[in-house]
């Protein structure tokens, strides 16, 4: 019996990396009976059938898991945004951060295309990024002339998953780091100011200290698993200052003696962060139940 990590899944076949050796494996029938499917990122025990093939016998417990796209045991969720084409959006950053925290992931922010932005755009973006740095998020603002290897090394060991809307440069980052991958990239649609997703399945690629994955289908952010009363816990500074509110169940909207609103007034919580919190709270509060 050997142990390895699923790095790719295609048509019911799971490619497992076991100490640098690759095996194409299939799950035993017992998984079908349990209606359980292995996913990319899983740590598995498998029996070797021949030199390059085997059967998965056991899936280790997942430390965390994304539903869409399906990937598990993520150490870092890298939120990739671009300075321009498409334009940098703090609202989108905040929505990705909420998703990250809701799944128990460690998020970090990477902004690309610095070389394509004007001085005034860079100044505005840096001002916004300082807000995230002050909260405690690791932030990188990079252009095509930056050392890509250094950017990836800063992420530390383990599995780093790239997330972000289409066209922000996720595949370009990977290609610069690993030119041998030749991942397809797409030009930005001028009419929509965004790209089409070029990555069609989740695959883990080796990097120094671990793996990195690009993720398809990560532009339609899904908050169905989040209750409105949980949203405040996923805005870290709101969660912290919320402990000073008079009422324990304060949602920081219309409640009296709210410390969060007082800290927004005092400038200790960025207005845009509070506005995005309120928008998302109301969006989730007003959604219709799905049956």
Curated annotation (Swiss-Prot):
Look up keyword Cell division and say if it applies.
no
Disulphide-bridged cysteine pairs: none
Query: Which is a Gene Ontology cellular component entry for this protein?
Result: cytoplasm
Q: Which UniProt keywords apply?
A: Cytoplasm, GTP-binding, Hydrolase, Metal-binding, Nucleotide-binding, Ribosome biogenesis, RNA-binding, rRNA-binding, Zinc
| Example of a GO biological process term | ribosomal small subunit biogenesis
Q: Locate the residues binding GTP.
A: 112-115, 164-172
The answer on whether this UniProt entry bears the keyword Cell inner membrane reads no
Q: Which Gene3D superfamilies match?
A: Nucleic acid-binding proteins, P-loop containing nucleotide triphosphate hydrolases, Probable gtpase engc, domain 3
Q: Which residues bind Zn(2+)?
A: 245, 250, 252, 258
The protein's required cofactor(s) are namely: Zn(2+)
- Which SUPFAM superfamilies is this protein grouped with? Nucleic acid-binding proteins, P-loop containing nucleoside triphosphate hydrolases
Q: Which GO terms describe its molecular function?
A: GTP binding; GTPase activity; metal ion binding; rRNA binding
Could you say which EC number(s) this protein's record lists?
3.6.1.-
What the entry lists under Pfam families is as follows: RsgA_GTPase (PF03193), RsgA_N (PF16745)
| InterPro entries on file | G_CP_dom, NA-bd_OB-fold, P-loop_NTPase, Ribosome_biogen_GTPase_RsgA, RsgA_GTPase_dom, RsgA_N
Q: Where is the CP-type G domain?
A: 63-221
Free-text cofactor note: Binds 1 zinc ion per subunit.
Q: What is its main location?
A: cytoplasm
| Location(s) in or outside the cell | Cytoplasm
Q: Give a short account of what the protein does.
A: One of several proteins that assist in the late maturation steps of the functional core of the 30S ribosomal subunit. Helps release RbfA from mature subunits. May play a role in the assembly of ribosomal proteins into the subunit. Circularly permuted GTPase that catalyzes slow GTP hydrolysis, GTPase activity is stimulated by the 30S ribosomal subunit.
Give the NCBIfam families listed for this entry: ribosome small subunit-dependent GTPase A
Family affiliation? Belongs to the TRAFAC class YlqF/YawG GTPase family. RsgA subfamily.
What's the protein here called?
Small ribosomal subunit biogenesis GTPase RsgA
> What would be the name of the gene that encodes this protein?
rsgA
């Amino acid at each position: 019996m050997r142990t390895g990590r699923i790095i790719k899944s295609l048509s019911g076949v799971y490619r497992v990396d076991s100490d640098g050796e690759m095996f194409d494996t299939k799950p035993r029938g017992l998984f079908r009976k349990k209606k359980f499917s292995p996913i990319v990122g899983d740590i598995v025990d498998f029996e070797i059938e021949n030199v390059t093939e085997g059967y998965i016998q056991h899936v280790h417990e997942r430390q965390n898991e994304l539903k869409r796209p399906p990937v598990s045991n993520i150490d870092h969720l890298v939120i990739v945004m671009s300075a321009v084409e498409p334009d940098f959006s703090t609202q989108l950053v905040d929505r990705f951060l909420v998703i990250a925290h809701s799944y128990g992931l460690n998020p970090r922010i990477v902004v690309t295309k610095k070389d394509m932005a004007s001085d005034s755009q860079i100044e505005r973006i840096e001002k916004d990024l300082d807000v995230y740095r002050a909260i405690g998020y690791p932030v990188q603002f990079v252009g095509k002339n930056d050392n890509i290897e250094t950017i990836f090394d800063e992420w530390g060991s383990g599995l780093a998953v790239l997330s972000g809307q289409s066209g922000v440069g996720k595949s370009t980052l990977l290609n610069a780091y690993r030119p041998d991958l030749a991942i397809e990239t797409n030009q930005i649609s001028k009419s929509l100011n965004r790209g089409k997703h070029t990555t069609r399945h989740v695959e883990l690629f080796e990097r120094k200290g671990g793996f990195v994955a690009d993720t398809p289908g990560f532009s339609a952010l899904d908050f169905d698993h989040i209750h409105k009363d949980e949203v405040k816990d996923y805005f870290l500074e709101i969660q912290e200052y919320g402990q000073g509110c008079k009422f324990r169940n304060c949602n920081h909207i219309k409640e009296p003696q709210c410390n969060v609103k007082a800290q927004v007034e005092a400038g200790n919580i960025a207005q845009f962060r509070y506005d995005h919190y309120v928008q998302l709270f109301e969006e989730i509060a007003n959604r219709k139940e799905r049956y």
